[in-house]
């Protein structure tokens, strides 16, 4: 966990273009959480960069090739976030069904408990 410093440094003249995160999600991640996750990660990255003195411009695209010439010209850097978000079963909270060997299912009634693992990377281009 990165905790951005509460005091910010002097503002810089550089703009960083922050592309929408392009994540792949495992099938067991609920669809309504996908955008929430993308938005929270983008906001946290934006906060970190702003605390370092950069001006952040959020771009409504996840592909750097979609940027206009004007956007490329005004940007000092473009930040692209990609990776895979996987929800894995928690072995302590799941049991193996005898009729389906090797498969795990949740013992909860309507929710699956697990650990969210981000196997992504931050690529600066």
From Swiss-Prot:
GO CC terms, sorted: cell outer membrane
InterPro entries: NeuraminylLac-bd_hemagglutn (IPR007876), NeuraminylLac-bd_hemagglutn_sf (IPR038531)
Record key words, sorted: Cell outer membrane, Lipoprotein, Membrane
Region (N-acetyl-neuraminyl-alpha(2,3)-lactose binding motif): 92-97
Location of the protein in the cell: Cell outer membrane
Pfam families named in the record: NLBH (PF05211)
Membrane topology of the entry: Lipid-anchor
Top-level taxon of the source organism: Bacteria
Protein name as annotated: Neuraminyllactose-binding hemagglutinin
Native source organism of the sequence: Helicobacter acinonychis (Helicobacter acinonyx)
């Amino acid at each position: 966990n990165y905790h951005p410093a509460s005091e910010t440094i002097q503002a810089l003249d550089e703009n960083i273009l922050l592309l929408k995160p392009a994540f792949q999600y495992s099938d067991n991640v609920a669809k309504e959480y996908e955008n929430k996750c993308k938005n929270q990660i983008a906001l946290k990255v934006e906060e970190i960069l702003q605390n370092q003195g950069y001006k952040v411009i959020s771009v409504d695209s996840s592909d750097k090739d979609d940027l206009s010439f004007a956007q490329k010209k005004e940007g000092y850097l473009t930040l692209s976030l990609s990776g895979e978000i996987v929800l894995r079963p928690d072995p302590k909270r799941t049991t193996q069904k005898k009729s389906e060997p090797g498969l795990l299912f949740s013992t909860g009634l309507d929710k699956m408990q697990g650990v969210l693992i981000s196997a992504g990377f931050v690529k600066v281009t």
